[in-house]
């Protein structure tokens, strides 16, 4: 494994790896130890006490963070009829039908989120092998397969983030940028944590929030005291 640079080592030395910090302390420390020369993202990782091999312990959804993520999301909407005008009025970057299926099949990916009306999923389904591995396939659980394209687009533009538990039960999500105030990041963190707490499967036993850490792009991880959640 490659050795981390001097700048990273200096930042990491400010974090006590044996200590678990409060949410407030962890966010402040993560910002202070950011070493990127750009406005880095602030990311959180929740390790949940779930078994993702069981169908009733799958966790996936989306939440609108009160302060957004600081990132502008480009939205592609698959729709037809009057839903095209509705999506455009809501601020969608690209709206169309089969022509966008063909563009994507040819390697076009100038978008961050895909929304589709249910009557377009027959066409969008052709892109499963392409969009699926990139996490871009529309899904009812995340509100991206819907007839209410206005609400879907507006929420994404307002700072909606999708979350999904990976094989080890880990949920990764961005809660903002280093330029955000501590209060904005804390509020976003609490919103996400609350949604995950409510999503706890009834069949999940033992400790639910096994570990939580916050980090910035390229920065060291800071552990959060799960007892404080």
Swiss-Prot record:
Belongs to the universal ribosomal protein uL1 family. Binds directly to 23S rRNA. The L1 stalk is quite mobile in the ribosome, and is involved in E site tRNA release. One of its GO terms (molecular function) is structural constituent of ribosome. This is Large ribosomal subunit protein uL1. The gene is rplA. GO terms for biological process: regulation of translation; translation. NCBIfam families: rplA_bact (TIGR01169). It comes from the Bacteria. Part of the 50S ribosomal subunit. It comes from Staphylococcus aureus (strain MRSA252). The keyword tRNA-binding applies. Signal peptide: none annotated. Pfam families: Ribosomal_L1. Keywords: Repressor, Ribonucleoprotein, Ribosomal protein, RNA-binding, rRNA-binding, Translation regulation, tRNA-binding. One of its GO terms (cellular component) is large ribosomal subunit.
